[in-house]
């Protein structure tokens, strides 16, 4: 694989970004779902930086217990500290840990990359929260001061009276978390009930020949609750017809969009892959945000691509933008691609097509303030 | 001779009639508008079996090409040169929009040359009857006048007769070295070379369309070859245009953000060289080192691809749109930026001028149709309605407001857009509604919140580019109709005097005839019971002299 590596180096020439490493991942039997997501996360710069920071500050703790996050941090650090600029790394410890920890990923079956991403981020959040709680109780017993920032870049919410009740905000939250507000308007009394919920990624229903912009619009479109599905209005104290809509109250710094390409078809009694053509622009603004976030611009930096015609088999690869170059990661192989090649992963406007490489998870980074 | 060529091309699938429409399940063959029904009249396509996709997929662009009577090249007679493509409108400014000066009554269309009588009779039943006589009908005399659709698919250029019911091309030209990407036609080209073709490799050809039609081979004949093997620029040609009134000059835009100006009488064989681009982020114009070589000038527009270019009809202004999301308008002679601005987000894919040069439409990856005003030097409206990227925009220069009184006060524009959502949308732009409120003093308009409108209240200086406007600042338009016209994402749209032409990326083209409101006018001529449906095709030549006034045209860029 050294030859492939040098090919990439040649392609980049003196434009090879200072300090950057492009390493493929070895596949341990259907672990491409894992490899593709890990590459996207590695090139999610704020995530990488925080994780490496965590790694350096925790290295001194000799008896640190191994967990999924330490394995991930270890892997990222391994990549970034490579002497060579390109090559292949075996994410063996990480994959072993993953399989040990969750039986879902233990088999050699084809796994869902989105499920993996979700699991991984939540796992990291859990670990950070646990550590934060431990540090917090330590702090609270030693001194009652409430520092704004404590070790590991962990941020405690601003003191506005309810500090202790607020959930812990980890750096994963700071990077990926957004807030949705679910507005329900009772059609009888017109009272609007708003309920906020947080998200680390958005799962969007998709339609044939549509765009991400349009899918986001549908996501926030008004839905009427009626018949079996009425809304219990607190003011009317009864079930009423209501209108419901989802808006983005706080857009995340890194917006992860999951396209629901795997759909359960009742008639078939199984999942089916939707190969719909869904175009995603390299820059995006959210149409369904509340002020003052209306015109926050995002830039696409990674795409996890599912290759194959069905949900239970196939392959995952990823496209990554690093220092204004687009790279194609396919397990151990890394290649440079043209920006315009991203368009070949939109999907197909015909149901049966030879093109089965479809964008599945999109990673956008905010170019403006989202805080 | 022609039959041989036609027979070869049309053999595999010529029997399918447009109405049968086997590739478009669930797609209606008409759509309703306030002025009436547009009906699917003809479809044009290609035999994809003949294509080999070795060069990868291309996106189909369509050019309308009007061949005039060869005998009288100097007199702009009755041939409705109105629906030529982007160029050659020397008297274009003479036409005022919305004055309703009889454009409705002008429904003449030149049937194609010698084949006219044959095709006319078959046209009546043509839409619905299975065509069993295609060979006899394609016996078109290419020496005569005619209207053709030129479109590219994969490694080939196809040429169809617009006014024939034949679905298959009358001619195909295959390129062995690279794929054709864009093309343009000038009906008034003086030395016969009227068709421009730009390739994926950067190569550019000029040819005579008539000569191609007369030749039986599948090769390009009699071509002048520029930028051979991409010697000057080897990035993809994205858009190509004749300079209106430019005496054979033409402009080619490339995927690397450059565009080149060629002059027809200069040598294409001598290689032009240009100095290195000093600052890729800045606009710059450089002349070729040798004055006798072609291209004569390089304009570095932007970083990333220039996706589409369009000249205003008088040739004074050149609009470009590109990957960076900016619309730029240049004064072509002085080579200076006049104005421009950014999309809401994402690349811009297409642009088109209004006939009077006052407005420019753009479409792009933000799913919006943008209306840019040259007077205000800013965006004056966003058309919201597409569910995917907007890939083609055009003003309907043949449309006149039903209630226009000719005073010019209530000028209303009709325009259309097509998108990758497979939809055709039509829009009305009412000046009273859109532009006037925007010019009011701050707070004067009840529709806009005060204090928001830095974008609207400032006078925008010449030569500057505007940033993306805020969403709440831009008035929104809604389409008057939205119709799914193809099963595949669309790539192009144009208006002709009697129809709307839509094209999809894969190279299927549909021709929708306008509502038969003008049937009342055409009843005077040889009223045939069935002619009402297809009235526009039948009007007699004696009205043709009037139609020369209407120098229309739709720029048609992907």
UniProtKB/Swiss-Prot annotation, chain A:
Tissue distribution of the protein: Constitutively and ubiquitously expressed.
Ranges for domain USP: 23-367
A Pfam family annotated for this UniProt entry: UCH
Motif (Bipartite nuclear localization signal): 83-100
Cellular compartments annotated: Nucleus
Single GO term (MF): cysteine-type deubiquitinase activity
Keywords: Hydrolase, Lipoprotein, Myristate, Nucleus, Protease, Thiol protease, Ubl conjugation pathway
Source taxon at top rank: Eukaryota
Chief place where the protein resides: nucleus
Active-site residues, as the UniProt record annotates them: 32, 315
Record's GO cellular component terms: nucleus
E.C. number: 3.4.19.12
One example of a Gene Ontology biological process annotation: proteolysis
Substrates-to-products reaction catalysed: Thiol-dependent hydrolysis of ester, thioester, amide, peptide and isopeptide bonds formed by the C-terminal Gly of ubiquitin (a 76-residue protein attached to proteins as an intracellular targeting signal)
Lipid-modified sites (N-myristoyl glycine): 2
Known function: Recognizes and hydrolyzes the peptide bond at the C-terminal Gly of ubiquitin. Involved in the processing of poly-ubiquitin precursors as well as that of ubiquitinated proteins. Required for the correct development of pollen.
Similarity section: Belongs to the peptidase C19 family.
Protein name: Ubiquitin carboxyl-terminal hydrolase 3
Gene name as annotated: UBP3
